[in-house]
């Protein structure tokens, strides 16, 4: 079976539905626009999600979802990565 996979990455402006661990016996669903990553403390990272209208009064608010509680991510609307990849350019100092 020959399957081709393209590189997938979380891109700012894309819309995702994230299912994560919530309270003891409950899963938490977060749906909205991905705004980026944030460092939480010293060694933890989270996703910044602007909540959509499905969250009622919380719509427009930012939710931080720690990476270690994420179970799955559904890609609802993917945007292309418009940021320039600096790692492909040679960086040096001339002075």
Q: Which residues fall in each region the model found?
A:
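Conserved RNA-binding domains used in RNP assembly and mRNA/RNA metabolism
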Residues: 2-95
